[in-house]
Curated annotation (Swiss-Prot):
The lineage of its organism: Bacteria, Bacillati, Bacillota, Bacilli, Bacillales. It comes from Bacillus subtilis (strain 168). The gene is yqbR. This is Uncharacterized protein YqbR. It holds the Pfam family DUF2577. InterPro entries: DUF2577. To B.subtilis XkdR. It comes from the Bacteria.
Amino acid sequence: MRLSEAIKHLAVRAVDSESPVDILPAEVVSVSPVEIRLNENDKLIIPADLIIVPKRLRAGEEALNTGERVMIVSLKGGQSFFILDKI
């Protein structure tokens, strides 16, 4: 899924549910597969199948590494998470 498609998907679902998205800080706990831990809940690990990672953060110089902090967008209900960028 391209970045523009993912953002559009998140926006449409937020409007449809009449609930805004949440922007949250998180930490990368695994890169293969990608898993993140929300800063607000140290015990909850978000699995790869719920995470959308932009292409630029998958490989190369900007690839995610374990322990890095990221900013994510979460739909209300926490069923999809999109990594915006490293922080």
